[in-house]
Design a protein with these regions (language model features):
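Vicinal oxygen chelate
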Residues: 1-4, 26-72, 84-109, 119-120
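Short hydrophobic/aromatic beta-strand micro-patches
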Residues: 7-9, 74-76
Length: 120
């Protein structure tokens, strides 16, 4: 078995793909109305974005009675502040709740949480 992609649902899969392509420096490989895929140039596992017309953004942090986060992406960076600025410039929002010092939680344009983190 080989993991090839993680799939995120969105009302506008192409817009979300463009956001992550900008953030990660990856290329769009497949661009269809209901599914867009990205992969790094090294051929590793990528990200796919599929049309979910009724997508409801998850609530971060967890709250009872609202849409729950089912997964999130962890993205290792060298410089947390510079990467955070790039994420904001690409269209992310900084989450109000920040649980750890070496991790920053952001919300992508579809409302999915993702983390930028550094080892240092």
């Amino acid at each position: 078995m080989k993991l090839t992609s993680t799939v995120l649902g969105a009302r506008d899969p192409r817009a979300l793909a463009v956001f992550y392509a900008t953030l990660l420096g990856w290329s769009i490989k497949t661009d269809e109305p209901e599914r867009v895929t990205l992969h790094p140039d090294d051929g590793g596992p990528g990200l796919s974005f599929q049309l979910e017309p009724d997508h409801v953004p998850p609530e971060w942090p967890h709250a009872n009675g609202v849409q729950q986060m089912q997964m999130h992406l962890d993205i290792e960076v060298d410089d947390l502040d510079a990467a955070g600025a790039a994420a904001i410039d690409a269209g992310a929002g900084l989450a109000a709740f920040q649980p750890q010092e070496k991790v920053r939680v952001y919300l992508d344009p579809a409302g999915h949480p993702f983390c930028l983190w550094t080892r240092e």
